Amino acid sequence: MDQRLDPGLSPYRTFTRAEWAQLREDTPMTLGAEEILRLQGLNDRLSIREVEEIYLPLSRLLSMYVGATQKLFRAMSQFLDHRNNAEGKMPYIIGVAGSVAVGKSTTARVLQALLARWPHTPKVDLVTTDGFLLPNAVLQREGLMEKKGFPESYDLSLLLRFLTDIKAGRRPVKAPLYSHFFYDVLPDQMVEVDRPDILIVEGLNVLQTGRPPRDGKAIPFVSDFFDFSVYIDADEDVLEHWYVQRFMRLRETAFKDPLSYFHRYSKLTEEEARETALSIWHRINLTNLRENILPTRQRANLILRKAGDHEVAEVQLRKL
């Protein structure tokens, strides 16, 4: 029997960049050139054209999704006689997933900026799952420092409790803060999330699930709390190149600070630094991508596929 999948059976509809750009229609551009520059991540590229052709159509799509979800929630509240939520509001949660160095943070920040300009969703918060990593002291004790960013390196129960409280409409809900400068969770430092209209959750493994239990008991996954999810995709060799580029730039900037966790790398020669970056990529990040991140790609509602120039070349939207 031929096991090849008929393209017509794919759960996704694929758009070229030009086809996707046409879906913007009359969605207004609400970001200026200076703001776009501020939203751009280190070693990422974000242009006005990218916002117009990729993110404005996505903004329009999400506007429809959020509106439909809010309408359904109001109908359910009436059906249940408003017993579930006294204020008639439930945050819409968007997950953003993808590899290290793919540009997740830039995408999340652009979406936050665009969605916050909708008249019906003025409050949009952004939380990264980095804050839910186990502290370095715990990772070292458990022998997991080489697995940082892998599923087992997160305080999953804390993350699930955070998302449960958000969906339940509790206020305010606190999330731990992470410092890339110190490469650790910041003790006793939290960010408050106070009943946003939309919450964007960005992280490596946010779409991951596990094996269902044999006893049939319900086990929640992070993605169970998402109303919509985006996966940022790129080829492995492209991701490797971007990661090394970013490492080399950090070597000349943040790593030079004596207080930086990675200060030792600033003293390497250029060749030594490049070899170190490649070693970290292959030993940790590529392994995590292949074993844990990439297998979750097909669980996303939308896949943004990037080319080597950091621009989105193709969009895949899950069929309803």
From Swiss-Prot:
Catalyzed reaction equations: (R)-pantothenate + ATP = (R)-4'-phosphopantothenate + ADP + H(+)
Enzyme class: transferase
This protein's record includes keyword Cytoplasm: yes
GO-annotated cellular components: cytoplasm
Gene Ontology terms describing biological process: coenzyme A biosynthetic process
Pfam family of the protein (one): PRK
CDD domains: PanK
MF GO annotations: ATP binding; pantothenate kinase activity
Subcellular location field: Cytoplasm
Swiss-Prot/TrEMBL keywords: ATP-binding, Coenzyme A biosynthesis, Cytoplasm, Kinase, Nucleotide-binding, Transferase
Transport recorded as keyword: no
Enzyme Commission number(s) from the entry: 2.7.1.33
Residues the entry annotates as binding ATP: 98-105
Main localization category: cytoplasm
Pathway note: Cofactor biosynthesis; coenzyme A biosynthesis; CoA from (R)-pantothenate: step 1/5
Entry-linked Gene3D superfamilies: P-loop containing nucleotide triphosphate hydrolases (3.40.50.300)
Family listed: Belongs to the prokaryotic pantothenate kinase family.
UniProt name for this protein: Pantothenate kinase
Source species: Azorhizobium caulinodans (strain ATCC 43989 / DSM 5975 / JCM 20966 / LMG 6465 / NBRC 14845 / NCIMB 13405 / ORS 571)
